[in-house]
Structures are given as C-alpha cells and as structure tokens.
C-alpha cells in the first residue's frame, strides 16, 4: 500500500472554504430587535398578519386587511390583546403559512422544528440529523459541476499521471483550484420549494470541505471528505425588500418577530455536515 498523505500534508486538509465566515454574528440577518414601527412602514410592511395588528396589539374580528393600506388596518374592528397573545397568534400563523412551502416528503415537518427553535431557542445553534441526512443526499447528487464529482475526478487524474506514488501536492492543488469553479450544494432545486428544505435552509451562508483521509492502494484508492455547512435562520433588510420574500405573509411575520424591538426573537445558526467516502478499485 502506498499512503498518499505523507508529510508535510496535515490532516484534516482544507480543500475549500467560502469567503463568507462561519458564526458571523455581524451579518444583517443575525440582527434582532433593532427596528421600530416607522422602520417597518418605510419598507412597506404595514400588513403583517391576517389575524392581528401586531403594531397595536389588536386581534381582528374578521380575516385581516390583506393588501389594504394601513389607514384601514388601524381602524379595523378588533379586540385588544396582550403581547403574549399576539406572539402566540403570530407563531401559529407562521407555522400554518409554512405549509405552502413544505407539504411533501420526509422533511416537510423540519420547518416546524426551526420555528419552534426560533421562538424558544434564544439564539442557540440548531442541529438536526434530518438536516445532516438531507445534506448527505444533496452532496451525492452527482451533477457535472458538483464538488464531490470534481474531487473524485482530480484524484483519478492525479493517480493515473503518477501511478506509483500519486503525488499528493499536485492532486490537492488541483482539487483546490477546480473547486473554486464548482457549483456548491444548496437547497435550491425545484423540489426544495415544496419539500420543506428550501424554506428551512433558504441559503447556505458558509461551507467548508476538508480531506480527512486519502490513501492509494495497489488495487485502487479511497478518500474521506468532510462537508460542513452553516445557514442563518434569520432575515435581513435585503431579503424583505425582495418581492420574492415580501409578497408572502410568512416572511413578513418572520421579519417582524425578529426585528421589531418589542418582540426581538433571536435568529440563529443552523449547522449541518456529512462525511463522505469516495473510492475506486480495480
């Protein structure tokens, strides 16, 4: 057996890391409780909920004003409620609205877990075996420009060019270079728009790919790769200015609960990872 990983290569070896940092608390989507009513109105967010006016703590006697302007909303018939009651209604409405993005497949209830964590987790990190499994499945969809396919191809080419040793510095440098132009795995396929993954992890903020082991044998080779990713379960101003988000009440409620100074529910980091073994034998 020829072990490709000879000194000075240190394991784990970073093959790729996004410019975006892990644990970036300074990101705008990680801010909370930093806005007042006027800030929301300036963003066109007068209509938050179909059930309550969260600015005035009024529960509507009938379905909310929809797209009707704030002047009508303010004078709508309703009952004064406490902030706790308003919070309960908003979170229940948020869960119900999430179903339009999460109604099929084994991950359809994942968003409910995230909403619960948003309310009660106090900003702590979120981990889920479901997310790890979904990331594993996503990684192993061998698209033309997928990272795992590029890594395997670089190893194959490197070993074929130097079969006796598999000259590791050239192989690793080739992987690092080609990963720069790869298509990172995200939950943005068509099915993710309704299976619960797109709404649960609407983007991946940071990713890291590391080599854990890499060995060359007389009859083939094997490598173990660690894929680590992090999303922010939070919304920034750019998100809510985007019509793709702001047209849905789900995101307006989310943004309100996070950013209004009187509610200020903390966003959090969603962490997931998978370890993949790739190999080829004669």
How should each PLM-predicted stretch be described?
Residues 2-198:
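Membrane-inserting hydrophobic helices used for pore formation or membrane fusion
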Residues 28-31, 46, 61, 66, ...:
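A generic structural signal for solvent-exposed, polar alpha-helical segments
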Residues 37, 57-59, 111-116, 204, ...:
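Generic preference for hydrophobic/aromatic residues in regular secondary structure cores
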Residues 183-219:
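Amphipathic, interaction-prone secondary-structure segments
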Residues 203-215, 227-235, 274-280:
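Beta-strand elements of well-folded, non-transmembrane domains
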Residues 221-225:
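Hydrophobic residues positioned within well-ordered beta-strands of beta-sheet architectures
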Residues 235-282:
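Active-site or metal-binding loop neighborhoods of secreted/extracellular toxin and effector enzymes
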